[in-house]
Amino acid sequence: GATTYGGDAKNPAGGDLADATDKADGATSFSYDLRIFLDTSFTGEDLLRTRLRSGNIADVYAGNGVVGLWSQEYGNSTGNDLTVDRLFYQFPVGDEFTFTGGPLVRQDDMLAVWPAAYPAAMTVDFFTYAGAPGAYNLTAGAGAGVIWSKDDFNVSASYISSNGNGSDPDTGGIATDGAGSNGTVQLSYAPEQWGVAVAYNYGSTDNNDLGLYSGNGTPLANKLQANGVTNSAALSAWWMPEETGFIPSVSAGWGINSTNSSADGNGITYDGSVLESSTSQSWYVGLEWADAFLEGNALGFAVGQPTFVTSIDKKNSSDDFVADGNYAFELFYNFQVTDNISVTPAVHYFSRPLGGDKDSTVTDGDSFNSFGGMIKTTFVF
């Protein structure tokens, strides 16, 4: 893939930010992500999963460029080493309950449903969070969860410590000050063709694998959420037509996050003032046409706003609005070449990916945007 940049924003040291970013991140790159699933069942109803992973995506597509929103869902670098990416055990109890636990389990492994029908082919990471990267933050670590399901109604509850492999309570452990705790509750109703879901998530300050990162939020949203305990909520809905054709599936989601400053009271300084709290939001709408033009292929389009700060609460001051918004667009077509091989060309556009951070040392201009294209080839066997 390759990216380009435009706008009249200037570097603090002078010169166009777009030109400087083109020079830093504008080359065409070619990289890989490998995932190996080792699944075992002892009863035919349980699952012991080990997932191995390797990759060398360490550039702009891993969120490491000036525009972090270019990060892909598969953006991962292990230095070409093969590592354990997942290790958990899942088993049913009766007809209504499912329990999951392990030393390396991810939040979505313990959800009854993923609240979206979009996308069939994952590319830019933001569009894979059902519009709410705060609530559905995909934290991984040591954890356990339970799912209750009955007549299309589902309740999911889980806890994860992203630092659960450590024994020092200041930096690790389970349910300690340094655990990096992440707790999630999801309520959903999901018949065959549609569904709705609401979710709540609690994320602690010390979670090193929690919530926002450069690939699903603006720089300011990332900076403020890293400073304290975050409570997040999400509302999602999706619908799929009974027959493929002209009418697409529709997925929509919205998320809101409230971050309180660290308990030490030092807070974080923004625009010359110490903050007590901040609020951020995100949303998206995704349309997907299954069997578009040819059976087995898919056409997808999405628009949304990656997590952006909407208000801040300064000490000894009233709430202040922050113009941090940015629009993201995605268009892809997934060719199913064979049962095992698919090719997905995609284009993306970000209208204002650096948001409105007044303290930013990167830009001091009026506008900055980014456009790019990529081709993803997937082999499944």
What kind of feature is each model-predicted range?
Residues 1-99, 127-131, 135-153, 158, ...:
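Beta-barrel outer-membrane channel/assembly domains of diderm bacteria
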Residues 268-274:
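Transmembrane alpha-helix entry/boundary detector in multi-pass membrane proteins
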Residues 58-60, 104-119, 299-310:
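Surface-exposed extracellular loop regions of Gram-negative outer-membrane beta-barrel proteins
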Residues 79, 112, 116-121, 127-129:
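Glycine-centric low-complexity/flexibility signal
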Residues 207-209:
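Short glycine/acidic-rich loop motifs that flank beta-strands on beta-rich extracellular proteins
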Residues 118, 168-170, 178:
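Internal alpha/beta core interface subdomains
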